[in-house]
Amino acid sequence: GENEINDIQACLFENGLMTAVYSNLDQTSDSYSLKLKSMSGTLYMLANTADLIDLQQMKESGMTEQEWLNTTIKATDGKAPRFFAGKLNLDEQPQGQYVLPMTLQHGIARFDLLMRAGGAISIKSITLKNLAQASYLISQDEVRSPEGADVQDLQFTFDQPLLKDTLGLAYVCEQTNTDLM
């Protein structure tokens, strides 16, 4: 489903450098936990990115936090990967706090089709034009597309015409795109 988590990993940045990677998080029902050695730096958590993002390799290459924030994720054949990301500034947390909740956010945008008309409507196909094919892994302060991101049209043809509202028609890279049609 849309909110399904298949894998989860995290990384810690201290003084602008990636210093730790966490890939085997403890899971209980719908929550994951990890133990931190100290309460400093910024913790980032990713879900459903294990096949896309190699945190260990990034750490070994000496990745800076600024490089991390500029990391992009790309659509494959017009399909954006369904991932989640979250961020927690540990320096801002109250001292003595042992459990720190982090909410993960969807890293993609969802298109829903809502049909509103006075008569009957049936839709056989839909084309989304000029979709950006990359987005930032970690949400920026405001939604924006990576510079130079490829664009592509995405067409949906339905075996049976759509006759009613359809949720989750398309999942695309998060973007600001005045050319999207």
Language model: regions and residue ranges:
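Tryptophan-paired
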Residues: 2-59, 114, 119-181
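Short strand-edge motifs at loop-to-beta-strand transitions and within beta-strands
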Residues: 30-32, 98-102
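Secondary-structure boundary elements
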Residues: 90-96, 104-110, 114-125
